[in-house]
Amino acid sequence: MQILLVEDDNTLFQELKKELEQWDFNVVGVEDFSHVMETFETFNPEIVILDVQLPKYDGFYWCRKMRQQSNVPILFLSSRDNPMDQVMSMELGADDYMQKPFYTNVLIAKLQAIYRRVYEFGVEEKRTLSWQDATVDLSKDSIQKDDKTIFLSKTEMIILEMLINKRNQIVTRDTLITALWDDEAFVSDNTLTVNVNRLRKKLSEIDMDSAIETKVGKGYLAHE
């Protein structure tokens, strides 16, 4: 697994790098924090671990830059005790968030879960789905309707795929959380809400925000 670790605390970077490499992860860091994207584009990681507090520009800035050209999974690290940091990271398209200090074995479990759901989930499924008047391209994480195309994060696409495959049926929140993170202990209920809200916001760009209905106390439903 190719991991880009964007962490300016060299002691923590070296500790994490050593631990992750024991699990056969290939870990690369950033030398110049003014040019994070150059390392990102050259290394082409499968997962990015991104610290919030960085020199020059913060992690939120670099997350925006990465999302402009890639849906690579991003896991944020932060030493700040601020719930809004977690909300902001999800809004920007991050896949997970951990507050420092943390247990390394929990980080590894999260990375493995992210890898499974992003790179192994539904590999035998057909790669396009027809939904209402739109075409959902699972391989490109995109939705096309008329002359408009929107792009989703990996997390948003997995949520949408599950809803479409069960269209006109309620998919419970617990079912979605289990599929996304493999273990409910690794994600808050609020994280799922943020991802669904972000998905709806993107669907509104192609006039489909009402295509997903919230069933209060139960889950979500994608209309035919």
From Swiss-Prot:
InterPro entries for this protein: CheY-like_superfamily, OmpR/PhoB-type_DNA-bd, Sig_transdc_resp-reg_C-effctor, Sig_transdc_resp-reg_receiver, WalR-like, WH-like_DNA-bd_sf
Stated role: Member of the two-component regulatory system GraR/GraS involved in resistance against cationic antimicrobial peptides (CAMPs).
PTM-bearing positions, type 4-aspartylphosphate: 51
GO molecular-function terms, A-Z: phosphorelay response regulator activity; transcription cis-regulatory region binding
Name the record gives this protein: Response regulator protein GraR
Occurrences of domain Response regulatory (ranges): 2-115
DNA-binding region as annotated in the record: 126-224
UniProt PTM comment: Phosphorylated by GraS.
Record keyword Transcription regulation present: yes
Gene3D superfamilies recorded: 3.40.50.2300, Winged helix-like DNA-binding domain superfamily/Winged helix DNA-binding domain
Underlying gene: graR
GO CC terms in record: cytosol; protein-DNA complex
Residue ranges the record marks as coiled coil: none
Keywords tagged on the record: Activator, Antibiotic resistance, Cytoplasm, DNA-binding, Phosphoprotein, Repressor, Transcription, Transcription regulation, Two-component regulatory system, Virulence
Cellular compartments annotated: Cytoplasm
CDD domains: REC_OmpR_NsrR-like, trans_reg_C
Gene Ontology terms describing biological process: regulation of DNA-templated transcription; response to antibiotic
Taxonomic source organism: Staphylococcus epidermidis (strain ATCC 35984 / DSM 28319 / BCRC 17069 / CCUG 31568 / BM 3577 / RP62A)
PANTHER family: REGULATOR OF RPOS (PTHR48111), SENSORY TRANSDUCTION PROTEIN BCER (PTHR48111:SF27)
Keyword DNA-binding belongs to the record: yes
